[in-house]
């Protein structure tokens, strides 16, 4: 008896699609991944997809630093993948496998970089980026135009020519990025027509590190709760995390005199940068664990901190935050002063905030730096 053996022919499909793995769904890592997908297509004409598990095609991983490094073997992270990681946890009691040192890890703040250095892992700092289009759109919407030529300020937004400089002035090659310069003649003070005194967007889990309860207590002490809008998971807040459209969020940010950011610790912290991108100043704890994108801003309001205590996360055991030690009456007074100053900001002040962000934290600036670490191409 003769057998006719048929050998299957493999169907090999080659694709230029760039695969990004996000650490979770409907979270900050997912949001960063979706923005990367949008702007790598806009500025480089590269199509990418966002996945939520590791695959052989993964080129970029956007996730929590401790989670990825501690599970580097179980996750089967491809050797060619670029890890763009950060974390709000200052310490973990789990061991990081030694082969994690085989990866170059990009992170978003100096204190996160210090963690990696102590672990013996090569690292570089590449900050997160905001939504360029919405930042320009809603900043331009709040600008007041005036024909008084003696007081007109002529500014170019997002072209990198601003004199305002920040801590992370990433200077990667952006020659292949299409410029989108918006010129606006502006004058006057736009603070009088703001809808809210204070806005806060506090995303994330219910582990308390965003200090939602503290902010509510401060607003009550200053009788500001009725003139504030809060996004958080608590029932006392006005909207749930990730429930707003991008237009609703940026409209909200642009209609506030002050953005409150009282988080204990952040790998980076996108919401306060989004607020500054539309000219809204930020009040925050004076802490190395939160002030990476804030400390060099032309206008910001630090609240006094008298040290830190290590606080274990109630939701993820073995992970710890750096909780600031403060005097409540003191920070209430400083918060009140911050709002008073924010109320008197001029358009020129708000332009400075907007340009600081566009120069340092726009995708037009950040993507060339990522490209460099991804082998020079996406």
Curated annotation (Swiss-Prot):
EC number, UniProt record: 2.4.-.-
The keyword NAD appears for this protein: no
Signal peptide: none
Keyword Magnesium: no
Pfam families named among the record's database cross-references: Glycos_transf_1
Alphabetical UniProt keywords: Glycosyltransferase, Transferase
Gene Ontology molecular functions: glycosyltransferase activity
Top-level taxon in the UniProt lineage: Viruses
Coiled-coil regions, chain positions: none
Top-level EC class as recorded in UniProt: transferase
InterPro entries registered for this protein in UniProt: Glyco_trans_1
Family the UniProt entry places it in: Belongs to the glycosyltransferase group 1 family. Glycosyltransferase 4 subfamily.
Protein name (database record): Putative glycosyltransferase ORF378
High-level lineage: Viruses, Adnaviria, Zilligvirae, Taleaviricota, Tokiviricetes
């Amino acid at each position: 008896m003769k057998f006719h053996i048929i050998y299957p022919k493999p169907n090999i499909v080659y694709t230029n699609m760039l695969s990004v793995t996000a650490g979770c769904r409907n979270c900050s890592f997912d949001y960063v991944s979706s923005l990367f997908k949008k702007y790598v297509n806009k500025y480089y004409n590269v199509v990418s997809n966002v996945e939520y598990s590791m695959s052989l095609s993964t080129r970029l991983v956007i996730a929590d630093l401790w989670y990825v490094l501690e599970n580097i073997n179980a996750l089967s992270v491809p050797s060619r993948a670029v890890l763009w990681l950060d974390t709000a946890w200052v310490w973990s009691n789990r061991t990081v496998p030694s082969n994690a040192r085989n990866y170059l890890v990009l992170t978003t703040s100096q204190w996160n970089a210090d963690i990696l250095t102590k672990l013996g892992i090569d690292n570089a700092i590449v900050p997160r980026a905001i939504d360029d289009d919405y930042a320009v759109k809603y900043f331009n919407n709040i600008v007041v135009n005036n024909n008084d030529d003696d007081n007109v300020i002529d500014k170019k937004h997002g072209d990198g020519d601003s004199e305002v400089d920040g801590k992370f002035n990433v200077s990667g090659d952006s020659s292949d990025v299409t410029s989108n310069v918006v010129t606006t003649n502006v004058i006057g003070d736009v603070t009088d027509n703001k809808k809210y005194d204070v806005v806060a967007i506090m995303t994330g889990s219910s582990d308390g590190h965003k200090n939602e309860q503290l902010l509510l207590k401060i607003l009550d002490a200053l009788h500001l709760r009725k003139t504030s809008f809060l996004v958080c998971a608590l029932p006392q807040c006005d909207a749930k995390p990730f429930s707003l459209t991008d237009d609703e969020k940026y409209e909200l940010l642009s209609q506030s005199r002050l953005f409150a950011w009282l988080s204990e610790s952040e790998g980076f912290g996108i919401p306060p940068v989004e607020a500054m991108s539309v000219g809204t100043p930020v009040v925050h704890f004076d802490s190395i664990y939160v002030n990476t994108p804030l400390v060099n801003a032309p206008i910001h309001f630090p609240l006094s901190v008298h040290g830190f205590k290590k606080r274990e996360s109630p939701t993820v055991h073995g992970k710890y935050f750096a909780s600031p030690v403060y005097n409540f009456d003191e920070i209430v007074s400083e918060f009140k002063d911050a709002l008073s100053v924010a109320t008197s900001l001029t358009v020129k002040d708000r332009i400075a905030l907007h340009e600081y962000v566009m120069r340092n934290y726009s995708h037009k600036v950040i993507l060339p730096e990522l490209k460099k670490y991804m082998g020079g191409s996406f």
